[in-house]
Amino acid sequence: MANDQNKDYDKIIVLDYGSQYNQLITRRIREFGIYSELKPHTITAAEVKKIAPKGIIFSGGPNSVYDEGALGVDEDLFKLGIPILGVCYGMQLMAQRLGGDVEPADNREYGKADIEVTDDSAKLFRDLPKDQTVWMSHGDLVTRVPEGFRRTATSINCPISAMDDDDRKFYGIQFHAEVQNTQYGHEILHHFAFDICKAEANWSMDDFITKQIDKIRAEVGDKRVLLGLSGGVDSSVVGVLLHKAIGTQLTSIFVDHGLLRKGEADQVMESLKGKFGLNIIKVNAKDRFLGDLKGVTDPEKKRKIIGRDFIEVFNEEAAKLNGIDFLAQGTLYTDVVESGTDTAQTIKSHHNVGGLPEDLKFKLIEPLNKLFKDEVRELGEKLGMPHALVWRQPFPGPGLGIRVIGEVTEDKLEIVRDSDYILREEIAKHGLDKDIWQYFTVLPGFRSVGVMGDGRTYDYTIGIRAITSIDGMTADFARINWDVLQEISSRIVNEVKNVNRVVYDITSKPPATIEWE
């Protein structure tokens, strides 16, 4: 939502210094019912004054404040009288710019650390235990606080783990309160948002719907919008939201590119066209996509090809329809950050943001690009969408094209479809579908020796990926009961052709991403 869509909300803005965790800070603030959004670190004090936030948070980042070209801040921000919280690099930047000292640490800290609160009157730590476990990730540290500040927490390797200047409402923490590994991170951010910033929890999904519909109507006017339905939750929610806003001005194209899950094409048509009355044109483009993917093994090239083909199909269908001015997409906040902001390292290009050609003929509408996945599900339920559709498994824009590692062929796609269907059946049968955030199978592309019956086999391996998460920014592997995993494995090797081995991925995010490609 643009700023003029948020004037009635109390806001806390987060300045981006390049941390892959920075979106988590905005998510944590939103969980309190306070609107939060990431802003570039280059934002000026004058621009901040127009936004009129209740508070400002400087995010962490991978650099040193002494690096050549180190990311800075408009120092007039410190004169606005707005509470500021510096996190990790943000604390070091605050200390340096206000007259303190920052030096390289003798012992860098990455991971869990124990801190001790040194001042019982510190507002960030009000009513919290003196000893706490936090998540550190830093190579520099503050060695002397600026004038007017005091140390409020310490650790063995970081003597100044937190600091504050309560008179000016400036606060710094060397650790990451936004991640789950910090024991009282939720409470620390809550203290900053409510006790220090005095923000009110007046942002809700109902308000988002009302304002976003108004925004869509104002932007689109009497023009027409084309939506690409992928079969996933995000584009489906966009379709229902747009239909609610502009009705028959929306035309949806559902591209059956041959990269969908088992039975998915029929489910999408029945749910959205049947229940909600969306005008959906179904295009069978399977041969086109698989033909263009033939011989391609590089994951980035596959994503670009799939994204390119999507846009080409849209262009062709739009030419038949005449008068299409806008293209709608289900881009989420997490899509944007994983494709890299101006200060964050690009992890992978997303289909919704990285595959668009420069000569795009449509104006883009991305009504979900400020929302996280769980917020999109909440939005879908508020719009009256079926629970089964809203809570279906997250599905990447490139579909099964990035769950077949290496070259994509019809035979390999069938292996992934069948194994994934078995996994979803078993997870639901054991009542785990609400506890596991995302689960799917992947075909790594290598073969291994096995024995089935009296014969030797040399067949494919299937990987199972099941993770727990809140918003997809960080994730841990799901601790599925061994008996359940054994049952899933047994069914896959017995029911899916050309598979003789099943492995379970137990890697967290980071260091891995959720998808394998």
From Swiss-Prot:
It holds the Pfam family GMP_synt_C. Pathway: Purine metabolism; GMP biosynthesis; GMP from XMP (L-Gln route): step 1/1. PROSITE patterns: GATASE_TYPE_1, GMPS_ATP_PPASE. It comes from the Bacteria. ATP binds at S230, G231, G232, V233, D234, S235, S236. Residues 11-202 form the Glutamine amidotransferase type-1 domain. GO terms for cellular component: cytosol. Signal peptide: none annotated. SUPFAM superfamilies: Adenine nucleotide alpha hydrolases-like, Class I glutamine amidotransferase-like. The active site is at C88 (nucleophile), H176, E178. HAMAP family: GMP_synthase. Homodimer. This is GMP synthase [glutamine-hydrolyzing].
